[in-house]
Curated annotation (Swiss-Prot):
Record InterPro entries: ClpP/crotonase-like_dom_sf, DPA-CoA_Dioxygenase, Enoyl-CoA_hydra/iso
One Pfam family it belongs to: ECH_1
UniProt-recorded name of the protein: (3,5-dihydroxyphenyl)acetyl-CoA 1,2-dioxygenase
Organism listed in the record: Streptomyces toyocaensis
The keyword Oxidoreductase belongs to this UniProt entry's keyword annotation: yes
NCBIfam families: DHPACoAdixog_DpgC (NF042432)
Length: 438
C-alpha cells in the first residue's frame, strides 16, 4: 500500500498553487473530447491550462527540488532508478508528475493521440539533474547494476553465455562479446533493446573473467540485408509513431544507464576488495561497425575506446529528419569531429562514409569487410592491460566531466520530452504508423 507523504512546508505557497493548477488541468481534460477530436478553441484552452501548470512546476522545483528528492530517497540514503523515482514522486507529490494510471493510458495510444504527460516528467528530471546534490546521487543510482543483471550474473560467470531477445552475450578468451541480434529490424532500438543492452553491459563489467568488451551487430534476416551483419539502424521509428518510445524507460534510461556505464563503469558496493580506490568497475570497449551506424548506433561509437569499420559502412545522425535530439551526440560529437562537421551531421543530416577522410575523425581503423574479424582481434589484444584501464579512466575524466554530462542531461530531459510531442516530429514519424505495440 502506497502512502502520500506529508506535504513540504509550503511557506511560499507554490505547492498549493501547483496542486490547484494540476487539478484544474485534470478537471478540464475530463470535459474535453479525445485529443484528435478537439476543436481549435478546445486545443487552445487545454494548452493554456498545461502551460500555467507547467510554469508553476518549474517555479516549485527551482526552489524545492532538493527537498523533494530528499523526501523520496530518505535524504539520499536510498538509490532510486529513474522509473522508481518518477513513480515515487507521483505518489508522494500528487500533481507533480503523471500517475501510473495516466501513463498507462498514454502508452495505449499512438504518439499523435497522447496528451503529453511525459513533459511533466521532463520538468521534474531536469530539476533533479540540475541540482549539485540530487543530480550526482541520481547518476550514481543509474550506474548501479540492475536487479536483472545481478540475477543472471552467477549463471553467466559459470557458463560464459547469456541469450536475450535483443542481445547475445558470450565470454571468450577474456572478451565479453555483445552481439546485437534484432535481425528482423536491423537492430532498431526500443525499450527491450535498452533493457537487454544494460543487462549485458552490467554482466560484462561485473564478471571478473572479462577484461575487454566488444560490441558488434549480428547477421540480419531483414529482406534488404539478409545474411549480412548490420550494426544499428537507431531508434525504432515505427515504435515512436505507435507511442512505444518512453521518455524515462527508453530515452533517459539509455543515456544514464548502459551508455554511461560504458564510459564510467558500474558502481558496486563497498564490500568488494579494492573498492576504496575504485568504486566503479571499468573496462575497455571496442565497437565494430558492419553496414551502417545510424542515429543511436552512431551515438554509441562516441563512447568506445576503439572503433573499427568495414570499408563499405556509413554513419549518420538524422536528427533533422526525425525531429528529436540525438542523445548525448550534441555533447560528444564536437570533441571528435569539430563544430563544423558536427553541425553538418546533426543539423543537416550529412552521411559520412567509411572511406571519406572525415570518417577517420569517428573511426580508428577502416578495413575491407573480409578483414574486419582479424582487425577486431588485434584491437582487443591491444586494449587488454591494466595501464590501458587506468589511462582510459583519466582520458574520460578529461574529455567529459561528470558535472558537464549531468548539466547536459538535465536540459536533455526536458528538451527531448518537448520534442517527443512536437508537431513536426509527429508528422515526420507518422508514416511509420500502425497499432501501438503490445
Amino acid at each position: 500500500m502506497t502512502t502520500v507523504l506529508p506535504p513540504l512546508e509550503d511557506t511560499d505557497g507554490l505547492w498549493a498553487a501547483l496542486t490547484e493548477a494540476a487539478a484544474s488541468v485534470e478537471k478540464l481534460l475530463a470535459t474535453l473530447p479525445e485529443h484528435g477530436a478537439r476543436s481549435s478553441a478546445e486545443r487552445a484552452e487545454i494548452a493554456a491550462a498545461h502551460d500555467a501548470a507547467r510554469a508553476l512546476r518549474v517555479r516549485f522545483l527551482d526552489t524545492h527540488a532538493d527537498a523533494v528528492y530528499d523526501r523520496l530517497t530518505d535524504h539520499r540514503r536510498v538509490h532510486l532508478r529513474l522509473a522508481e523515482l518518477v513513480e515515487a514522486a507521483a505518489t508522494a507529490f500528487p500533481g507533480l508528475v503523471p500517475t501510473q494510471q495516466q501513463l498507462a493510458v498514454e502508452r495505449s495510444l499512438p504518439q499523435a493521440a497522447k496528451e503529453g504527460h511525459e513533459i511533466d516528467q521532463g520538468i521534474f528530471l531536469r530539476a533533479v539533474l540540475r541540482s549539485p546534490l540530487a543530480g550526482p546521487h541520481l547518476l550514481d543510482a543509474m550506474l548501479r547494476p540492475t536487479p536483472r543483471a545481478l540475477e543472471l550474473l552467477p549463471e553467466f560467470v559459470r557458463t560464459g553465455e547469456v541469450e536475450m531477445e535483443a542481445v547475445h552475450l558470450e565470454r571468450r578468451d577474456g572478451v565479453a562479446r555483445l552481439t546485437m541480434c534484432r535481425d528482423d529490424r536491423l537492430n532498431a532500438e526500443d525499450g527491450q533493446q535498452v533493457d537487454d543492452m544494460e543487462t549485458a553491459v552490467d554482466l560484462a563489467l561485473l564478471d571478473p573473467g572479462v577484461r575487454v568488451g566488444l560490441l558488434r551487430g549480428g547477421v540480419m534476416s531483414h529482406p534488404r540485408y539478409r545474411g549480412k551483419r548490420v550494426f544499428s539502424a537507431g531508434i525504432n521509428l515505427k515504435y515512436l509513431s505507435q507511442g512505444g518510445i518512453s521518455l524515462v524507460d527508453f530515452l533517459m534510461r539509455r543515456e544514464l544507464g548502459y551508455i554511461h556505464k560504458l564510459v564510467r563503469g558500474v558502481l558496486t558496493n563497498d564490500d568488494r576488495p579494492g573498492w576504496w580506490h575504485s568504486p566503479r568497475i571499468e573496462k575497455p570497449w571496442v565497437a565494430a561497425v558492419d553496414g551502417f551506424a545510424i542515429g543511436g548506433g552512431a551515438q554509441l561509437l562516441l563512447v568506445f575506446d576503439r572503433v573499427l569499420a568495414s570499408s563499405d559502412a556509413y554513419f549518420s545522425l538524422p536528427a533533422a529528419k526525425e525531429g528529436i535530439i540525438p542523445g548525448a551526440a550534441n555533447l560528444r560529437l564536437g570533441r571528435f569531429a569539430g563544430p563544423r562537421v558536427s553541425r553538418q551531421v546533426i543539423l543537416e543530416g550529412r552521411r559520412i562514409w567509411a572511406k571519406e577522410p572525415e570518417a577517420r575523425l569517428l573511426v580508428d581503423e577502416v578495413v575491407e569487410p573480409d578483414e574486419l574479424d582479424a582487425a577486431i582481434e588485434r584491437s582487443l589484444t591491444r586494449l587488454d592491460g591494466d595501464a590501458v584501464l587506468a589511462n582510459r579512466r583519466m582520458l574520460n575524466l578529461a574529455d567529459e566531466s561528470p558535472d558537464g554530462f549531468r548539466a547536459y542531461m538535465a536540459e536533455f530531459a526536458l528538451m527531448q520530452a518537448l520534442r517527443l510531442y512536437g508537431h513536426d516530429v509527429i508528422d515526420k514519424v507518422g508514416r511509420f504508423g500502425g497499432r501501438p505495440p503490445a
